[in-house]
């Protein structure tokens, strides 16, 4: 009997395929297993490399909205949702990005971060409702992730966000999927079949993580969150970061440890402010005014263009 095209037995998604090279996986010893899994991760890097033009277009499209005070709204389910939460959460300590401007939405809510919530990803209306409840609007940028490219929760969120005027960026690991068609900025991460068939927490997830790192980091750089390649907007919240702030300030200004400590104390721990203070001989309030006039860009505040 012929299997109809709609049958799950004929799933066309590459991430659901059986990898022909690893059919004896359960017979391998630990060393061989580790080699197989690590070698396969290289496909994730290559998939992201192939997506560089699409990632760059997404950065260019997102920047104007974020410069006007818009938010990053992340949407995903399962592994993709957890990666979305991770990227959104790390923007504040790394770049002092306001937490209210990084909004992660995961199918099933916060409980889904730690455990699977059955059926949550199949609810398109829940995705749309979550986007509306987050107050998504024309200034915002929605980043949607789904390895399959077909997750109803994510598709519902993207369609709702577009209707509300938000910019939509869609990352999927299968070509020709609804998510890539629905998003204004589609990004294909074509990783192919997994070593363990269908386990997209493997290289599909790795590719998504690399792409998210790239996308959000590039945005933060263009928004003035670094000076050179120095993390001058780091949010000092523990001893390790306090030491990092001191080291960065000394490196960027040539100041002594004592001078850098004093400037950081006056600047409330803000490296960027201390940098401008020490380089231009300004007080903390004067440095803050200069930075505000420069749109938060240290290089512009220093008159370096």
From Swiss-Prot:
It catalyses: N-acetyl-D-muramate 6-phosphate + H2O = N-acetyl-D-glucosamine 6-phosphate + (R)-lactate. The keyword Lyase applies. Residues 1-24 are annotated as: Disordered. Its EC number is 4.2.1.126. One of its GO terms (molecular function) is ether hydrolase activity. GO terms for biological process: amino sugar catabolic process; N-acetylmuramic acid catabolic process; peptidoglycan turnover. Homodimer. HAMAP family: MurQ (MF_00068). This is N-acetylmuramic acid 6-phosphate etherase. It comes from Deinococcus geothermalis (strain DSM 11300 / CIP 105573 / AG-3a).
């Amino acid at each position: 009997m012929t299997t109809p095209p709609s049958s799950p037995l004929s799933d066309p998604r590459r991430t659901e395929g059986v990898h022909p090279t690893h059919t004896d996986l359960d017979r391998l010893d630990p060393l061989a297993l580790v080699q197989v899994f690590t070698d396969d991760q290289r496909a994730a890097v290559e998939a992201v490399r192939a997506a560089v033009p699409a990632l760059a277009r997404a950065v260019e499209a997102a920047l104007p909205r974020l410069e006007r005070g818009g938010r990053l709204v992340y949407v995903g389910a399962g592994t993709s949702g957890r990666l979305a939460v991770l990227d959104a959460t790390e923007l504040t300590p790394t770049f002092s990005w306001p937490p209210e401007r990084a909004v992660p939405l995961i199918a099933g809510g916060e409980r889904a971060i730690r455990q699977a919530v059955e059926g949550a990803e199949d609810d398109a209306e829940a995705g749309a409702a979550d986007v509306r409840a987050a107050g998504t609007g024309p200034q915002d940028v929605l980043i949607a992730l789904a390895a399959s490219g077909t997750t109803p929760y994510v598709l519902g969120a993207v369609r709702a966000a577009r209707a509300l005027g938000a910019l939509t960026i869609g990352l999927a690991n299968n070509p020709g999927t609804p998510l890539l068609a629905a998003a204004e900025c589609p990004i294909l991460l074509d990783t192919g079949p997994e070593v363990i068939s269908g386990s997209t927490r493997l290289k599909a997830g790795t590719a998504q993580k690399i792409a998210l790192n790239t996308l959000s980091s590039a945005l933060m750089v263009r928004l003035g969150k670094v000076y050179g390649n120095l993390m001058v907007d780091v949010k000092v919240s523990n001893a390790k970061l306090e030491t990092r702030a001191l080291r960065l300030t000394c490196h960027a200004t040539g100041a002594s440890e004592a001078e850098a400590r004093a400037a950081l104390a006056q600047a409330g721990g803000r490296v960027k402010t201390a940098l401008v203070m020490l380089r231009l001989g300004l007080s903390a309030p004067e440095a803050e005014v200069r930075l505000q006039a420069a749109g938060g860009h240290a290089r512009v505040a220093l008159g370096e263009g």
